[in-house]
């Protein structure tokens, strides 16, 4: 399939399926785009994590030129997954994974810059979330691709206008994604801050996760003090009701 200036190919080698990401013919010999493909490889090797698609190499492939070689993921995009029926607990489980992997990516000094459900996959076995596209990701150590980037509807206003690029741009995009996931009360309160003007957003993913946990604990404390918990035979009912983040 084609995606912008890239081509995605499913290939089989040594009895195993792989994902190849190559440059489209129109830009295949362009040094800038070749540099961007190399940059994506370097960044993905730098942020190795269970929540990031594994890249194993960058090599020449007949008919396609240089390709990123990535693990094949048996699953669907988060965009497709959200169109299916899933319980609130399942949606919270996926949202938790998104926050965890982004906290790691940001701790590695990388900003994704193009977070959206179609750039994430959920595996069929185990419902594991994986980020699959770092084509627009950036880090301070790189000089290429420092212009506005992102996808309408998910990109932050300041990033769209070419303003400062930092983790708060990704946090805005996370807020948009969480809003589409129809999560529990603590998440709904948390995502509102993601969508505020730049200086009013969470400064980083750690602060966001801690705030959502705090909102959840306060909600449980309120239910306990109000006697709601006493009306239940076990705390499991409450746990299932709010889905701890």
Question: What is the meaning of each model-derived region?
Answer:
Residues 106-122:
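Catalytic-loop of the protein kinase fold
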Residues 145-158:
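Conserved activation segment of eukaryotic-like protein kinases, specifically the C-terminal portion
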Residues 27-46:
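AlphaC helix of the eukaryotic protein kinase fold
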Residues 63-77:
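Conserved short submotifs of the Hanks-type protein kinase catalytic core
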Residues 94-95:
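Activation segment signature within eukaryotic-like protein kinase domains
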Residues 77-87:
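AlphaC helix of the protein kinase catalytic domain
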Residues 54-66:
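Short beta-strand micro-motifs within the conserved protein kinase catalytic domain, predominantly
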């Amino acid at each position: 399939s084609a995606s912008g200036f890239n081509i995605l190919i499913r290939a089989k080698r040594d009895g195993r399926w792989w994902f190849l990401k190559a440059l489209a013919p129109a830009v295949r010999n362009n040094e800038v785009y070749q540099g961007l493909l190399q940059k994506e490889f370097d960044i993905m090797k730098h942020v190795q994590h269970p929540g990031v698609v594994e890249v194993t190499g960058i090599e020449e492939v007949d008919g396609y030129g240089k390709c990123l070689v990535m693990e094949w993921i048996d699953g669907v995009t988060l965009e497709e997954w959200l169109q299916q029926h899933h319980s609130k607990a399942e949606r919270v489980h996926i949202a938790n994974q998104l926050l965890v992997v982004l906290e790691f990516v940001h701790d590695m000094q990388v900003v994704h810059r193009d977070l959206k459900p179609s750039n994430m996959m959920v595996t069929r076995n185990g419902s594991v979330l994986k980020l699959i596209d770092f084509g627009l990701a950036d880090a301070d150590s790189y000089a290429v691709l420092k212009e506005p980037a992102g996808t309408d509807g998910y990109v932050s206003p300041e990033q769209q206008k070419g303003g400062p690029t930092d983790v708060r741009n990704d946090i805005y995009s996370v807020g948009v994604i969480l809003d589409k996931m129809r999560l529990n009360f603590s998440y709904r309160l948390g995502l509102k801050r993601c969508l505020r003007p730049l200086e009013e957003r969470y400064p980083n993913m750690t602060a966001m996760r801690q705030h959502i946990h705090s909102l959840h604990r306060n909600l449980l404390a309120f239910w306990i003090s109000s006697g709601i918990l006493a009306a239940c035979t076990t705390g499991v009912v409450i746990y299932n009701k709010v889905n701890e983040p």
